[in-house]
Amino acid sequence: MQKVFERPKGLTDVDFGYCAGCMHSIVHRTIAEVMDELDLVDKTIGVCPVGCAVFMYDYMSCDMIEAAHGRAPAVATGVKRVLPDKFVWAYQGDGDLASIGTAEIIHAAARGENISVVFINNTTYGMTGGQMAPTTLIGQRATTCPSGRDPAVNGYPIRVCEMLATLDGPSYLERVAPTSPAGVMKLKKAIKHSFENQIAGKGFSLVEVLCTCPTHWRQSPYDCLKWVDENMTPVYPPGVFVDK
């Protein structure tokens, strides 16, 4: 009998501890599959964020480092410069990357550091209680803006890919929405392209993933997928922003 589906070697045997419908698990598995296909598991050093994916080191079978909040690009930069033969990726959420870590991600991209970043945009601070994030949509409710985000008070959402695309350093920037099987395939293709760019020494790359947070959005997992397509993609359109 032919085996057509199995657990990637890039994942450990530890079960994911995420909320039902959370898309971190999908992205974790996709990263693991790509590491398997490119024979990177034994060569990789991943950098964990602070946030819901803080325990990512329990799930990935490659070497992992835990970074302080927002500092994953700086840590990844240091690792890659000291160990240039290693493959290095960083994994960050929107509060981690686009708020406290804004300086780190902008300057890593501006320098063209030869690292890969996977950026999870679920428009909320998940681990700390559903507060407004830099990516929270106008009118979207959060615990820190219960009446909805008001641009007169809270400003406007930050579009990370568009912002980084103004720099000369990035070699590849893409945003994907894995809300369907076709979307998951696009996610895998994007992550693989990002990883291949690093292998080729092309410099900085980032894949932004539009994800759900059923717990803090207070919606069913299915309704969350629809919400991404109907509300997030008009503000954060999927597509390739840089590909050198």
Show the residue positions of the predicted features.
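Active-site-proximal loop->helix
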Residues: 102-107, 127-141
